[in-house]
UniProtKB/Swiss-Prot annotation:
This is Imidazole glycerol phosphate synthase subunit HisF. Heterodimer of HisH and HisF. GO terms for cellular component: cytoplasm. GO terms for molecular function: imidazoleglycerol-phosphate synthase activity; lyase activity. SUPFAM superfamilies: Ribulose-phoshate binding barrel (SSF51366). HAMAP family: HisF. It comes from Psychrobacter arcticus (strain DSM 17307 / VKM B-2377 / 273-4). It holds the Pfam family His_biosynth. Keywords: Amino-acid biosynthesis, Cytoplasm, Histidine biosynthesis, Lyase. The keyword Cytoplasm applies. GO terms for biological process: L-histidine biosynthetic process. Signal peptide: none annotated. The active site is at D11, D130. It comes from the Bacteria.
């Protein structure tokens, strides 16, 4: 069995790491290169860097920051934000990213994901899905939750069902899915395990859980109950509540295979 991964996430806005609650109410958490260096030293399995306003501001992700980060950290680096065309992916990979996350552009042009996977290999294409729980639906007399995907850093609703979208992205060639519960983001109440289960049971690519971690138990629940392959967190690491080592030790103690 493959070891499960812990991935600290750096949401970056105007060159600073920030952390919000449900995609708003933003707090400063430091310089991205310094923060990434700290997680590299703590034994993070990967680091994710998301330029959270690149799409809504219609600009490119800061390549210079990615270059500096890639020189400093020696674990796989996933970069996203403002990725709209093949050249953006090439530039990010050339700047030192190991994987590139596509979010809004996948919604506008789904075939872009397939084209990117074909050109660069699906191992370096991550599709990021920002999902919000909407009105429940009835299926065969059973009330089921339904999630919809949002774009532009969680600002624009699409009407697209998140679970069906996850399947479509996996079929088109995404090597991995980064699934964020917008309802959970920054709330510290735990992942949306129902959402994670719905997606992990329907796709055959790795799924990363994101949105809502408040303690180490939440990380373990993502794997044990949500069925995910990797757990992403920000607040609990950024503000010094836990280190990555503590998180790994806790998960290993729960019987989860980790790289210690």
């Amino acid at each position: 069995m493959l070891a499960k991964r812990i991935i600290p996430c750096l949401d970056v806005d105007n060159g600073r790491v920030v952390k919000g609650v449900q995609f708003v109410d933003i707090k400063d958490a430091g310089d991205p290169v310094e923060v990434a260096k700290r997680y590299n030293e703590q034994g993070a399995d990967e680091i994710t860097f998301l330029d959270i306003t690149a799409t809504s501001d219609e600009r490119d992700t800061t390549y210079h920051t990615v270059e500096r980060m890639a020189e400093t950290v020696f674990v796989p680096l996933t970069v996203g934000g403002g990725v709209r065309k093949i050249a953006d992916i090439r530039n990010l990979l050339n700047a030192g990213a190991d994987k590139v996350a596509i979010n809004s552009a996948a919604v506008f042009t789904p075939e872009f994901v397939g084209e990117a996977a074909q050109k660069f290999g699906n191992q370096c294409i991550v599709v990021a899905i920002d999902a919000k729980r909407v009105a429940d639906i009835e299926v065969d007399g059973i009330i089921m939750p339904r999630w919809e995907i949002f774009t532009h850093g969680g600002r624009k609703p699409t009407g697209i069902d998140a679970v069906a979208w996850a399947r479509k992205m996996a079929e088109l060639g995404a090597g991995e899915l980064l699934v964020t519960s917008m309802d959970g983001d920054g709330t510290k109440k735990g992942y949306d395990l129902a959402l994670m289960k719905q997606i992990t049971s329907r796709v055959n690519v790795p799924v990363i859980a994101s949105g809502g971690v408040g303690n180490l138990q939440h990380l373990a629940e993502g794997v044990l109950e949500g069925g995910v392959d990797a757990v992403l967190a920000a607040s609990i690491f950024h503000f010094g509540e836990y280190t990555v080592q503590e998180a790994k030790a806790y998960m290993a103690a729960q019987g989860i295979q980790m790289r210690l």
